[in-house]
Amino acid sequence: MEIVDGSQRLRTIRDFMADKVTLRDLETIPAANNFRFSDLPNSRQLKFAETPIRVIILDNTTDAVTRTEMFARINTGGTTANDAEVRRGSLPGPFMNLIIELAKDPTFVALTPISPQLVDKREREELVTRFFAYLDSFDPTLNDGEGDIATYKEEPRRFYFSFVKERNDRIAAELDSGGISPTIDAMRTDFTSTLDFIKAVSPHGFTKSETGNQVPRVRFESIAVGSALALRVDPTVVDRVSDMTPLLSSNEFSDVTRSDAANVKSKLLNRIRLTRNWLLAQ
């Protein structure tokens, strides 16, 4: 059995109970500084030894998605890794490399002014992941032509994870067979053309104002994915639309980009379709 999370803490506890280490630099209980385990009263030693430790065992049959779910749940102390960080660590591959690359794209950075803290938490990688997951999973032929994301079951963590894994595998297979990946080329083109369009028609990029330093995910999804879908249907949207302000300042846009219950499928589809339909109607 291999300890994959918490190994250092468990070894420290073991060594303390074996009298191999001495307590140092304690702040909460400074009176215990310079104590070894054997220096504690017998009753305290017994209580320490009988304190339960929660252990979760994942066997070889546990799938990758479940592993990620479990790591997210057990990582409840200290600094918790968010979903983007967990995916980055557990899903290495060519698509993940593309996500990391595009998250640093100068145009994308300019259109998504966020705090250094959010940058450190991989927020831009989260936005790039959502862009591709929703865009490439959207089937415009479903739901009487309104389009749908059939694989989205209101479990966003599993949805994003499964999408990244599938794209990693697909792109790796393409690279292995021919040395090039049409999928990567198409995704990079979609991303770049969408950013160029948003830069031209949205005065404040993905923010709400000129001085804005926040990019609400629901706002980003509506603008980015909706625009990309419209460009796929009719590339001449680039020539016909010069300003998205009438849409972005409308009550309808405000309504569909509220953050409450944002992961509900109907709300996700409504905010994506609104931008797409508005652009195509111009």
What positions do the PLM features span?
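C-terminal subdomains that position terminal phosphate/3'-OH groups for nucleotidyl transfer/ligation
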Residues: 134-282
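Basic- and aromatic-enriched surface patches that contact anionic nucleotides/nucleic acids
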Residues: 1-162, 238, 242, 246-247, ...
